């Protein structure tokens, strides 16, 4: 079976947690969300091919297949990340400048910056005296290195 379009997500289902259907997860890393063409297997061994159009990506909770007995959906695995919660605008600026010079991809949440787990980043944060935490989080989108050029 090949899926070419995602029509629903478990977040849009009012009765998802109470459904009588078998919930069959496909556990993937956040990096696989970006792959438009791939073969995936659910926890029960159900095989699904994915062939999405240009610009389309998978999202956590996407339903790939549903019938009267089963819902097969994507669940993104948590990954260890570095979470920085700046205590001032100055601290935020210093952190952003230092990390930006290294062209590191970052994500932002309420009051915090999220970075891929990297010992070099940890060394920099320790050197600068910036408090951080390591957490396991499900990322809504993968870290993606953006291309750039200096003018």
Curated annotation (Swiss-Prot):
Its main location: cytoplasm. The keyword Cytoplasm applies. Pfam families: UreE_C, UreE_N. One of its GO terms (molecular function) is nickel cation binding. SMART domains: UreE_N. GO terms for biological process: protein folding; protein-containing complex assembly; urea metabolic process. One of its GO terms (cellular component) is cytoplasm. It is found in: Cytoplasm. Keywords: Chaperone, Cytoplasm, Nickel, Nickel insertion. Gene3D superfamilies: Urease metallochaperone UreE, N-terminal domain, UreE, C-terminal domain. InterPro entries: UreE, UreE_C_dom, UreE_N, UreE_N_sf. HAMAP family: UreE. Involved in urease metallocenter assembly. Binds nickel. Probably functions as a nickel donor during metallocenter assembly. Belongs to the UreE family. This is Urease accessory protein UreE. It comes from Bacillus cereus (strain ATCC 10987 / NRS 248). The gene is ureE.
